[in-house]
Regions:
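Short, hydrophobic/amphipathic alpha-helical patches that form generic packing surfaces
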Residues: 14, 18, 276-281, 356-363, ...
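N-terminal leader/propeptide and maturation segments of large enzyme subunits in energy/redox metabolism
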Residues: 117-123, 280, 284-321, 488-567, ...
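A generic structural motif
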Residues: 175-186, 243-246, 367-381, 438-451
């Protein structure tokens, strides 16, 4: 929609960016208040409120947010109605951001260790003392030409935040490792192979009439759930007279499976084989694009799919042959159709193959390309910075563990951490056993995490509501989107920006380090990227001079270019003639169940989210369980093992065990047990400590053969009764009367 003269005059009268044009925006009245608070006094009007735009950092999606501020205090977070990714919607994690800002257990000031590593015993110091200590150690290493003994571990980064860390590490000769959840690594590797792009593709569900999902819990936590939930709503109800069909393939009954028209409970690790069998039906019933057939088979043609006839693979995948044919025919005849894949489908030793085979179905039905439901995203004119995260593989983490343990090929004399908790996230590698051998550990933390408990120096880091930042949205909604994060409020504690501290260290050390990092602070680095957007003369915000443009992108919460598009259709990937078979750790006779770890909607995979009580209390949609870890089994498995809800069992794998209560999920198939990720922390404040167990600690370190990502669903387990029971905290069902000590139980009923 264009900007009318009346709209433009309103903007000029009410906005600090009077010479800005917002292209392609309807500009709701409410949004006239969304302006940068950088130069606005903290209390503009006592009792009045204002809304400021920024970027959510509670997951990697990068949704746009607006924050309600009254008298200098953030009161509420909502979705930015103008941001193209989420268009005003926000998930529970995004809403809980204010709890992170005002958390009572935040690291309030710099801390220096006084006790043994791991005991979390510290004393408070000033920033001057803390930075003197860190600067001196860094200067000594540079002076000894030992900068390559520095290791930096962060969470996933993009844009100028990633560029600052990359240049800092490059100038020192240090290693920079990004720690992400395993599924992010394998999805990126598979899409790079399937679509030839470093950016994740945009699955426009709202344009499809049929969606076939392989393990991707896109209505739960997969990749960009708010974007996909909006698309799903339009897919179901957004087109008069048209209601799309959803089929979900998953060994666990997830929220996406619960919403599907049909759920195929396949055997774990067989998703790629099922995709090839569907392809066989498409090819042999003339429902597939001939050119795509030739490309996918490297010229071998339709005969290459003959080994995957439904009758030949039915037992291996656990789906009857006729059901495979019915799904394939519906997928081929109900155009446009889209196949998406991720989550547990990629969590095996053949994970990349499973995902690529599923993505290949889109080529067979002509769904890839401009104007179709599977679209590539154009590169934004934002400079030579990392546009996508670069998560480290399991082998890289194993190499770091070995280096810490042996000191070869060189010791780790300085370990710097930000937004990463390897003690918790790499428990399957026993990372905490070797962490103590690092020379000096510095952790930039918002909440004291399990790794920070081992640190020699803990520096309080800003939350995303107190800091500057940028976000190269990935996946974007078919066109490039850059989100701009700005400080919404003044720092609540004595915290600082991790990136600003790196820049100040570079100035203090001097030499090549200072030359590589010319910016005085993160804000100026981001402004450099914004200048390139301004010079392009494209996109949603346009202005005569840069300062007006800068105010405009802050006011809108970002920049996007709806006219940018990738017109070329990528070359389909060549599929293997002999698909790899999923391998599992543990003998099936001794460990009869396949363990399926999954990411709950609230606390996700852990980290600071586990410390937020709102998210601990978010019910898992299918089970309604909260506040603890559980083992989810089906009724057949429960009957065979004599288990009932609330029985405490030991979940034992070949490498470890955890104890959790049982929940009997009527939708769970036999042969699998599902356990949520995200709990079992020893730190993270009062709301996370001692709640549940960390399922990562019992996983075997098997990896996907292609991407090197952790095959987190490749571990077999057994359930052993402990003879104890525990109350399962949930929202569903009746609550029987129970008594308290020294009190008489009273049952309240409706008379």
């Amino acid at each position: 929609m264009g900007v009318t003269r009346r709209d433009f005059m309103k903007i000029a009268a009410t906005s600090a960016a009077g010479a800005v044009v917002f292209a392609g925006c309807s500009i709701p009245e409410r949004e006239f208040q969304i302006q940068s608070p950088v130069r606005i006094p903290e209390d503009v009007l006592a009792g009045g409120d204002a809304w400021y735009a920024s970027v959510c950092r509670q997951c990697l999606a990068g949704c746009g947010i607006i924050v309600r501020v009254m008298e200098g205090r953030a009161k509420k977070i909502e979705g930015n109605p103008d941001h193209p990714l989420n268009r005003g919607k926000l998930c529970a994690r995004g809403l809980a951001g204010v709890q992170l800002l005002y958390h009572p257990d935040r690291v309030a000031r710099p801390l220096i260790r006084t006790g043994e590593r791991g005991r979390a015993e510290f004393r408070s110091v000033s920033w001057d003392e803390a930075l003197r200590e860190l600067t001196q150690r860094l200067q000594n290493l540079v002076g000894q030409q030992a900068g390559n003994t520095v290791v930096i571990i962060t969470g996933p980064l993009t844009g100028y935040r990633a560029e600052i860390v990359r240049r800092f590490a490059r100038a020192l000769g240090a290693d920079h490792l990004q720690l992400a959840t395993p599924d992010q690594t394998v999805v990126r590797a598979a899409q790079r192979r399937a679509f030839g792009s470093d950016f994740l593709v945009d699955f426009a569900l709202e344009q499809a009439n049929y969606v076939l999902s392989f393990g991707a819990d896109f209505l739960g936590t997969w990749v960009s759930p708010v974007r996909y939930s909006r698309g799903y709503g339009d897919f179901r109800q957004g087109r008069p007279g048209t209601r799309g069909t959803l089929v979900h393939v998953d060994p666990r009954f997830s929220i996406t499976a619960a919403n599907a028209d049909e759920w195929l409970a396949v055997k774990p690790g067989s998703e790629g084989l099922l995709a090839l069998s569907i392809a066989h039906v498409l090819v042999n019933e003339n429902l597939a694009n001939p050119a795509a057939i030739q490309a996918l088979t490297a010229g071998a043609g339709p005969a290459a799919f003959n080994p995957f006839r439904p009758e030949l693979v039915s037992d291996a995948v656990g789906v009857p042959p006729e059901r495979i044919r019915e799904v394939a025919r519906a997928f081929g005849r109900t155009r446009p159709a889209v196949a998406i894949a991720g989550g547990v489908a990629g969590a095996h030793t053949n994970g990349t193959f499973n995902l690529v085979a599923a993505y290949a179905l889109n080529y067979l039905v002509g769904s890839v390309g401009l104007g179709r439901p599977v679209r590539l995203v154009a590169r934004p004119p934002y400079g030579d910075v990392p546009y996508t995260p670069n998560p480290a593989t399991v082998s890289q983490w194993q190499a770091l563990s070995s280096r810490l343990d042996t000191g070869r090929p060189r010791p780790v004399q300085l370990l710097i951490l930000f937004d990463a908790d390897p003690v918790y996230q790499l428990q399957y590698l026993g990372f905490e056993k070797v962490l103590g051998k690092a020379g000096y550990i510095v952790s930039f933390s918002t909440l004291l995490d399990d790794t920070a408990a081992y640190a020699d120096l803990v520096l309080p880091a800003h939350t995303y509501l107190e800091d500057w930042g940028d976000e190269v949205t990935d996946p974007a909604p078919s066109y490039p989107v850059i989100g701009f994060q700005q400080p919404i409020v003044n720092p609540f504690y004595d915290s600082r920006s991790f990136f600003d501290v790196l820049l100040s260290l570079a100035r203090a050390v001097g030499g090549r380090l200072q030359a590589e990092l010319p910016w005085p602070n993160l804000r100026e680095a981001i402004r450099e990227g914004a200048r390139q957007l301004h010079r392009s003369g494209r996109g949603s915000v346009q202005a005569v001079d840069f300062e007006a443009f800068w105010n405009g992108v802050l006011q809108r919460g970002g920049w996007w270019d709806t006219a940018a598009a990738v017109e070329a259709v990528p070359t389909p990937p060549s599929l293997p003639a002999q698909p790899p078979v999923a391998r599992f750790q543990g003998d099936a006779r001794e460990y009869p169940l396949v363990l399926i770890p999954f990411e709950p909607i609230g606390v996700a995979s852990g980290g600071p989210l586990a410390g937020l009580p709102w998210l601990q209390a978010v019910p898992e949609p299918v089970t309604t369980l909260v506040w603890h870890t559980w083992a989810e089994v089906g009724p057949e498995t429960a009957r065979r093992l004599g288990l009932a809800e609330g029985d405490v069992v030991a979940v034992e794998s070949p490498v470890g065990r955890i104890e959790v209560p049982v929940y009997v999920n009527l939708g769970m198939p036999p042969g699998v047990v599902a356990v949520p990720l995200g709990r079992g922390q020893r730190q993270y404040g009062r709301y996370a400590q001692g709640r549940g167990a960390n399922v990562l600690g019992i996983l075997a370190p098997l990896t996907d053969e292609d991407s090197g990502a952790l095959a987190y669903a490749a571990t077999r387990v057994r359930l052993v009764r402990t003879g104890r029971r525990a109350r399962v905290v949930k929202f569903e069902g009746a609550v029987p009367p129970f008594g308290f000590e020294h009190e008489r139980p009273v049952q309240v009923t409706r008379g």
